[in-house]
Structures are given as C-alpha cells and as structure tokens.
Swiss-Prot record:
Topological type in the membrane: Multi-pass membrane protein
The protein's name: UPF0182 protein MAE_41360
Annotated GO CC locations: extracellular region; plasma membrane
Family: Belongs to the UPF0182 family.
Subcellular location as annotated: Cell membrane
Length: 959
C-alpha cells in the first residue's frame, strides 16, 4: 500500500506538469495563429473554425467518455464478485464457458479492439496531417460494421508487422490487466474519436449552412444538396456512434468474462440476469445503428462503380436497394426485441442451463443472425442470377435509363453540358492574305515552351546561386506598339502572349559556410525580379528574346532591364521584390538592425529594409516569447538585432498561405505571377491561384480516373508578392458549394467584380480544370445511350513527340480568332482523335477574356473528312528526307535535337501545324531554337524562323 501511495504521489505532479505543458502549447498555437489571422484580416474565419473544432472535439470526447465509463461502471457493479458458484448471489442465466472458449473469445475481442484503435488512430492522423496535393474530399469513412473495413484492417496488418505486434500487445494486456488496459484504451480511443470529429468541422458547417442545388437525383428525388452536404455527416455520425458502441460492448463483455477469477478457475459461470440485460441494451443500440447503416448504404448505391455505368444500375434499383431495406427492417426488429428484453426481461429458470441440450438456449438469438445472413446471401445470389438471365441478354434495354442518368449527371457535374458544340469543316483556303488578316494569331504562335525557357533562364538569368526560377507561366499582356505624343492620349496596344518567370530566393542554395541564423532569417529575405519573354520571338543565337530581364540598368541599378521604351510603358515593374512566392519556405524578421540583401550589383550587393504591410510585430515584449515558443526558435529571444518595429513574416509559401486561411478549397498546382498596377507604388507583382470546389458525392456522376465527380473553378485567389495580402474572389456565383461557404464565412469572399481591372485582365481558364473536363469529354460527348453503350464514338487524347519521347498532348494557350468571332482571344485548346486512330476528330476551346471567360466551345470535324492529327504530322516531318537529314547531322555533331510541342492552330476555317526544334549542345544544357517546322495539308517546310517558313510554305517555292 505504501509503494502504491508513493507511486500515486509521484504520478500526480508528473501528470499535472504534462497537462499544463499541453495546455500551454495549445495556448501558444491559438494565440500565435490568432495574431497571424489578424494580420491577414481573417480573424473571424479562424475563430469560427477554431470554435467549431473545439466544440466538436470536446463535445464528442465528453459524450464518448461519459457513455463508455458509465457502462464500465455498470459492468463493475453487475460483474460476479465471488469465485465459488454456490455462493453467487445471482444465478447465471446463460451456459458456462470453459477456459479454451474463454481465451478464444477474449483474444478475438481484444484483437478487434486493437484493430479499431489502430484504424481510428490512422484516420485521425490523416485528417490532421492532410496531403494538400490530394483532393480535399469527404473522407471515405468505413464503419466497423462493413466487410470492407475488416478487409482494410487485415491488409494493413499483413503489410505492416508493427501493427500486428501492437494488437498482440493489447490482447496480452487485456488478458492480464483487463480493467487497467480498458481504461487506458478508452481514453486513447476517445481522444482519437474526438480528433476525427473535430477534423470534420467542415462537414458539420456544410450540413447546417448548405444551399440547395435545386436539382433532384433521378432515383430517390432528393435535392443534390442532401448528398453533398448532409449524407457525409450521417456517415460520420455512424462511424462515431458505431465505434463507441462496439468498443463499449466488447469492453463490458471482457469485464464480465474476467470477473469471478474465471481465468484462474478455468471457467466462466455464465451471464447473470442484470449482465444479460445490460448486454441486451448495448446490442439493441448497435442494431439501431445497423438500421442507420443500411439506410446510408441504400443512398450509396448511387455511387456504385459496378455495372455498365457509374451509379445505381438495373440490379441496384430492382434488387440492391430492397435488400438494404429488408436488412434494415431485420436489424430494426432485432433492436426492438433486444430493447424489450433489456427493459422487461424475465428471469429464466436455472435448471434450463443444466440440460444436456443447453446449446438450444442460443437459438432465439441466432434466428435474426441466420435470417440476416440468408437475406444478404440470397440478395447476392439473386443479383447474380438476374444479371446473367435478365440484364445481360438485353443489357442496353435494361440499363438504358441508368445510362441516360449517368450521362446527364456526369456532364452536369463537370460542366460539359455548358459546352457549345459546333461543326468545324476545314477548307483549303489558307494563303498569305488570310495570314495577314490574322496577323495577331501568327504573331503569337508559341515557339518557346516553358520547359526550354526555364532551362535557359537558369543558365542566363539566375545571376547568383541563391536565385532560382521554380516555374514559368503562360499569360498575355497588352503591349504598346507606338508611343503617344502625350501621356494622357489613348494608347495603341496589342495582345501579346508571353512567358513570365519569377526570380525567387532559394535559401537551400546558399553556401554552407554562410548558412547562419542571421542570414537565414534576417538577410536572405526575398527574391528579386522576373523575366518576361514573348512566346514567338527568338534572339540572336536561337536564345529567348526578353521583354524584361536582368537586374540593374544604366539609369537605375535596382530596375529590371527592358527591351524598349514601349515595354516600359506596357509592363509595370517598380521594385519587384518577392517576399511571398513558391520557394519562400522559411520565416524572416524585418526590419532589424541588419540590412536585408536586396539584389547583387557588380561584385557587391545592394541592401534594403522592408517597408511593406505584411508581418506581425514581434520586436519587444511577450510576442517575442510567444513566437519563439511557437516556432521553437530560441535565437529570437537572444538576438540583439530586433527593433520595436521588427515584424515576423511567416507562412510565406503562397500555397501554404492560402490553404491555412481556406483549407476547404482545393488549389491549382500552378500559381502564376502577374505584373499589374493596382494603385500601390511599392507592389506590382501578384500571384493568381485558381481554387476549386469539388465533391465526390454527386449522384450518378462518373469520376473516371479522378477521386472527385464534381468540380467548379469557383474562386480566384490573389496574393500580393510584396505585402502578402490575400484576397478571395468568387468566380462562379452559381456554384451551390461556394454559396454555402460564402454563407459560412461572409467576410472571406469578394465578388469578382471587386478585383482590380488590371488583374482581372490576366485571369485565365485553368489547365487543371480543363484537363479534367477534356478527359471526361472523351466518353461523355456521346449523349445517345446506344452510342454510349457501344462506345461507337470513343475519343482519345492524341500523342506527340516532345523532346525525344512520345507523350499525350497537353492543353495549350493560344491567342487566336475563333471561327465565329471578329477579334482575337486568349484561348486554351485541346485536340482529340478517335479511339485507335490518329486523325483529328475535334478540338475543345476554353475562353478566358472579359465577359467570355469560362465559356467552352467544341468544334467537331465532319466524320467523312480526314484531318491530320499530331502523330501523323510528326510522322510526315520525320519522313521528310531534308528534315531528317538535317536532324541526323545535328545529332552526330555534338548536339541533340529536341522536338517541341506540335501546335495545331485554327485560322478561320483552316488548320496550321507548327513545331519548333530545339538544339542542345552536349557541353551545356541551354536549349536554342534551331528551326521551325510548319505544315499545312500535305506541305511541310523547315526554316530558321517562323516568318521564313510561312513565306516559303505559301509562296509556292518548296524546292
């Protein structure tokens, strides 16, 4: 007793200290994040998320613990207290269990508890450490009542030995120290459940704030909002309540089985009447949850991947849903029956259990189990028989209504129903006069691709080791073609397709000898400048032509060098410091007594002090201590370089920045930089990130190879590269999901009309969304059920040679005039070929300019016309003797020829094919444009420039 008392006296202070440590750390997290969200102007957004997370986490934890420990307390009260059967105060009401049976049952229950604990722990971990590269979807929450859950657990154990060892340890602990281990597991299990519930705060908010779609599903007639906003919450509640219910039942059973020294005596006397009534009550509750499970499963048939189409097919509608109903009824009746026995159960006669046929005692309890299994197995057999005898012989007739549903739903969910389909009949009418009429299209033909341009930038424009170009992006700018006599006069300008690349600071490239705390957090704080290249121009030596490049000019050492005065007027540059970007992964403090490296100049450096709006004051007082704790950076406390104005700039990675503010949105993988004047003299550079609302809950919508079956580009996010401010602009006000989030966070979103005009002119149709739609359109352009069923008109994404390897054609941006338009637009285009063939069948275009933004156009070629596809043109190019001879000569001459993207360019009612050839010398990796190949109909030419190639192609001189 003294030893136990000493242990208790030691444990209490330790637990108290650990508790204070955890609470203190949580307090630091909350206060630090509150200050950051205040700086961003989104404190209300953070507080709403936090309050729901805390409320749901604590609420579910308290309810779960209350239920579990109340039942364990009842079990302690009702368990056998004495070891001798003749002295039991209550007669057993069930047969006794020998030692072998006791060990088998206890081991099985312990293994199940251990498996549940591991499963719920992994689920909680996945919710609180999300992979933002994956779609942000309603989690696949498999209930322990599902066979798929058992299969998943067994798979995990077989592939991870340590999980099996943990389960074995828990089983052993439950056999030896039952009460102690049950209490520990109860607490851990409850904590995991509370993390899961808190991590699903978004589902709760969507449930209460959900905006109806005003579209009903074709099977049950529910508004689609029920499936997207409400059904995920019911699945979550099932997961929570089922987990608590099963664990509590098993914990109570173990408590009863190991009472009365049953392991020592080698036998369990049987369950008493109070024990049985307790177990009946728990079983009754689980049967009630099984009813909920079958109700949910009936709705989940609308996402069935089996059958001819995605969603509920003939068998699901005529058999599957009724099997779920019958199984639910059986579970409901069983729940009522067990509930009645728990409330009004009468004492059975003891002599019944001394009968030699005592196994018959279990018969009434096995009836619902057998009935349940019979219905389930019969349903599987009947479904298979009907599939073979009724459906397969007349599959199109039987499945036609469900094919129509899938086509209609998939097209609506991916916005394919908004596509304006037209016929494009190519004519042999392309000549010099037509080219002149479409000179803006010709002047914007993309010879430079982002990949070779980045390679060139890294060789010629990085300037210092610590600078890096992480990415390059296609955009368009209005470039002036003449200078006005007076500034206030209207400027004459043309659209110019360009490639822009940010020169960011890559601290990982700083030499090890210079890798100090001061350099990392006080000196190397930002990148500087960008390059801007027209896609169609080539400088001397085949290098890119730059509108904007370098750092420093004769007039101003901090300015970027521009190609002409016209570019000075066209492109706002200012002091292009990049404090927030794609590589800014570390936090910095500024201003301090240490000057920041601004940019290199000659053999030295120019220094600067940040004067932007970003950052949290940490120069003095408690905030310095707070963020030293939050960042675990004790150097902050001892640094003598801070001033009262010193600010902390953290979460400077733009993806992490926007995900922290709005984690419920999905973000495009490719943010792009924009140089635009929004009225701030110190900030001209901005990042635009496309954000999506997605779901995997749209009934009958086929996700294909994706994990989601509904998507909208609902939000455009703008991040200031200097100040770090973030603005969310709603781009699709008709999307019910973004309408729901706007109701939840009314101060988070702005109308797209509020975006500055200079930025709005740079929004573009996102490639990620377009690629998804283009992939879905391969099959779902077929709207006739019979054509769809037979796959008579299946399309494919064509192949091209890029570099030296074949690859699928990616979408590409063009400035071109659509067939029915009178002016050039910024277009995203994707070609198609028929299945197993190489000729073109169609091309899809997405518009990006002004009021036309977001409109999709599909131009289909007449099926009787043969139009060359990319692979066929590539073959013609490689078969041309002059071209192949020249390429072979280069490849033998210490260089390597890389083929660029083959662009198919619609010009009025004709198609022009253009492919640049890059030359890379063996001694360096700088790609240069060596030749441009142009094809029209059966004619192919290769010349040093695009202009020469076009002149030769349309002059009739191809000798």
């Amino acid at each position: 007793m003294l030893i136990r008392h000493n242990r208790s006296s030691i444990a209490k202070p330790i637990l108290l200290f650990l508790g204070c440590l955890v609470i203190g750390q949580l307090g630091v997290l909350v206060v630090a994040n509150s200050l950051w969200f205040t700086e961003m102007g989104y404190l209300n957004t953070f507080l709403k998320q936090l309050s729901w997370q805390l409320g749901l986490g604590w609420g579910s934890a308290i309810l779960s613990l209350l239920f579990i420990f109340t039942n364990l307390r009842l079990a302690q009260r009702f368990r056998w207290q004495k070891a001798k059967e003749d002295s039991y105060p209550l007669s057993p009401q069930s047969p006794s269990i020998n030692l072998l049976g006791l060990l088998i049952i206890a081991t099985g229950i312990g293994a199940w508890i251990g498996s549940m604990l591991l499963y719920y722990s992994k689920l909680a971990l996945s919710l609180w450490t999300p992979d933002f590269n994956l779609p942000n979807l309603s989690s696949s929450l498999s209930s322990p009542l599902e066979i798929v859950w058992i299969r998943q657990v067994l798979t995990d154990i077989s592939s991870n030995l340590w999980q099996g060892l943990i389960i074995a340890f828990l089983v052993l602990g439950l056999l030896i120290k039952t009460e102690y281990f049950l209490r520990i597991i109860s607490i851990v299990f409850t904590v995991m459940l509370s993390f899961i519930i808190a991590g699903q705060w978004a589902n709760f908010l969507k449930y209460f704030y959900g905006v109806p779609f005003n579209i009903n599903d074709p099977q049950y007639g529910n508004d689609l909002g029920f499936y997207i906003f409400q059904l995920p919450l019911w699945q979550l509640l099932e997961l929570w309540l089922t987990g608590v219910g099963i664990y509590t039942l098993f914990a109570v059973i173990l408590t009863y089985l190991f009472s009365a020294d049953s392991l020592s005596l080698g036998t369990f006397p049987g369950f008493s009447r109070p024990q049985l009534r307790h177990l009946y009550a728990l079983w009754s509750g689980l049967m009630g949850l099984l009813v909920l499970h079958h109700i949910i499963q009936r709705y989940l048939l609308l996402y069935s991947p089996e059958g001819v189409v995605y969603g509920a097919g003939y068998i699901d509608v005529h058999v599957g849903q009724f099997i779920e109903i019958i199984l639910g009824i059986i579970a409901g009746i069983t729940s009522i029956w067990l509930g009645e026995k728990a409330l009004f159960g009468k004492k059975d006669r003891r002599k019944l259990y001394k009968n030699t046929k005592k196994k018959l005692v279990f018969f009434p309890y096995l009836v619902p189990v057998f009935l349940y299994l019979i219905v389930w197995i019969s349903g599987t057999i009947i479904s298979g028989l009907l599939q073979r005898t009724v459906v397969q012989p007349n599959e199109l007739v039987r499945e036609r209504p469900y094919i129509e549903r899938s086509i209609q739903s998939t097209r609506a969910a991916f916005s394919l129903d908004r596509i304006d389909a037209q016929v494009f009949d190519p004519q042999a009418e392309l000549n010099a006069e037509v080219l002149e009429r479409n000179h803006l299209t010709i002047d914007n033909i993309r010879l430079w691709d982002t990949k070779p341009l980045l390679e060139t930038n890294r060789q010629l424009q990085q300037i210092r080791l610590y600078y890096k170009f992480p990415d390059a992006d296609i955009d368009r700018y209005r470039v002036r073609v003449g200078l006005p006599e007076k500034i206030e006069e209207r400027q004459i300008s043309e659209k110019q397709q360009t490639i822009i690349a940010a020169r960011e600071l890559d601290y990982s490239a700083v030499p090890t000898s210079a890798n100090t705390w001061v350099n990392k957090h006080l000196v190397y704080t930002h990148g500087y400048g960008f390059t801007l290249s027209p896609v169609n121009l080539v400088a001397a030596g085949g290098l890119p032509y730059y509108f904007v490049k370098d750092i420093g000019t004769n007039k101003d050492e901090g300015a970027l060098q521009t190609s002409s005065e016209l570019i000075d007027y066209s492109i706002p540059i200012g002091k292009p410091r990049i404090y927030y970007g794609e590589l800014t992964n570390n936090y910095v403090m500024t201003p301090t007594t240490v000057e920041e490296l601004d940019f290199p100049s000659g053999d030295g450096n120019v220094y600067n002090t940040y004067d932007g709006k970003g950052g949290i004051l940490v120069g003095t007082g408690w905030r310095r201590w707070l963020f030293a704790l939050y960042l675990r950076d004790w150097q902050m406390l001892f640094s003598q370089d801070f001033t009262p104005e010193t600010r902390l700039l953290m979460r400077r990675d733009i993806q992490n920045r926007v995900q922290t503010i709005a984690p419920f949105l999905n973000y495009d993988r490719n943010p792009y930089l924009v140089a635009a004047d929004v009225g701030d003299s110190s900030s001209k550079l901005h990042w635009i990130i496309d954000a999506y609302t997605i779901s995997n809950r749209y009934p009958y919508s086929d996700p294909g190879k994706d994990k989601f079956n509904y998507i909208r580009n609902s939000v455009k996010v703008v991040v200031d590269a200097y100040h770090g401010t973030v603005n969310f602009y709603v781009a699709d006000e008709n999307d019910p999901i973004i309408q729901t989030w706007s109701k939840i966070f009314p101060h988070l979103f702005k109308s797209l009309a509020e975006m500055p005009k200079t930025l709005r002119s740079h929004i573009r149709y996102p490639e990620d969304l377009f690629s998804t739609q283009a992939e879905r359109l391969l099959t779902y352009h077929m709207t006739d059920p019979q054509v769809f069923y037979n796959r008579e008109d299946q399309w494919e994404i064509p192949l091209e040679i890029y570099g030296t390897e074949p690859q699928a054609v990616s979408p590409y941006y063009l400035i071109m005039k659509l067939p029915d338009s009178d002016k050039e637009e910024f277009i995203l285009l994707h070609p198609y070929t028929p299945s197993s063939r190489q000729n073109l069948i169609a091309w899809l275009a997405a518009r990006s300019d002004d009021r036309e933004y977001g409109k999709l156009l599909l131009y289909q070629f007449p099926k009787q016309r043969l139009v060359y596809g990319p692979n066929q043109i590539e073959a013609l190019i490689n078969q041309d003797p002059d071209i192949s001879q020249q390429i072979s000569l280069w490849n033998r001459d210490g260089s390597k020829v890389l083929q660029g993207h083959l662009l198919i360019i619609p010009i009025e009612q004709s198609l022009l094919y253009v492919e640049p050839l890059y030359l890379v010398a063996d001694q360096n990796s700088v790609p240069t444009i060596a030749r441009v190949t142009v094809a029209y109909q059966n004619k192919i030419v290769m010349e040093p420039t695009l202009k020469e190639a076009l002149e030769k192609l349309f002059s009739g001189d191809q000798s």
